[in-house]
Amino acid sequence: MTMDTAQLKSQIQQYLVESGNYELISNELKARLLQEGWVDKVKDLTKSEMNINESTNFTQILSTVEPKALEMVSDSTRETVLKQIREFLEGIVDTQ
């Protein structure tokens, strides 16, 4: 019996929320992004994009800003959060 990817993802997300780990990881990420000034940089980037392209809508702005915002996440923050996620997954996934 195999589980498809969507089912597995759904179960992991559910367990992540129920165990409280989602909130812990999310809070850590938010704190690090605020501390690094990432939030302000993304706000500035968004404002700039809106001024340059006054006729664009939310979807267009998001498609422009999101890739740049993701690139602006520091390596240390990315590594820390991914480590937390890996540790969580190792705790629930049977690798044998």
Curated annotation (Swiss-Prot):
The keyword Cell membrane appears for this protein: no
Gene Ontology terms: biological process: chromatin organization; mRNA export from nucleus; protein transport; transcription elongation by RNA polymerase II
InterPro entries associated with the record: TF_ENY2, TF_EnY2_sf
A GO MF label: transcription coactivator activity
Keywords of the record: Activator, Chromatin regulator, Cytoplasm, Isopeptide bond, mRNA transport, Nucleus, Protein transport, Transcription, Transcription regulation, Translocation, Transport, Ubl conjugation
Entry GO CC: DUBm complex; nuclear pore; nucleoplasm; P-body; SAGA complex; transcription export complex 2
UniProt family annotation: Belongs to the ENY2 family.
Subunit and interaction comment: Component of the nuclear pore complex (NPC)-associated TREX-2 complex (transcription and export complex 2), composed of at least SUS1, SAC3, THP1, SEM1, and CDC31. TREX-2 contains 2 SUS1 chains. The TREX-2 complex interacts with the nucleoporin NUP1. Component of the 1.8 MDa SAGA transcription coactivator-HAT complex. SAGA is built of 5 distinct domains with specialized functions. Within the SAGA complex, SUS1, SGF11, SGF73 and UBP8 form an additional subcomplex of SAGA called the DUB module (deubiquitination module). Interacts directly with THP1, SAC3, SGF11, and with the RNA polymerase II.
HAMAP family linked: ENY2_Sus1
Protein known as: Transcription and mRNA export factor SUS1
Species for this entry: Saccharomyces cerevisiae (strain RM11-1a)
Lineage: Eukaryota, Fungi, Dikarya, Ascomycota, Saccharomycotina
Record gene name: SUS1
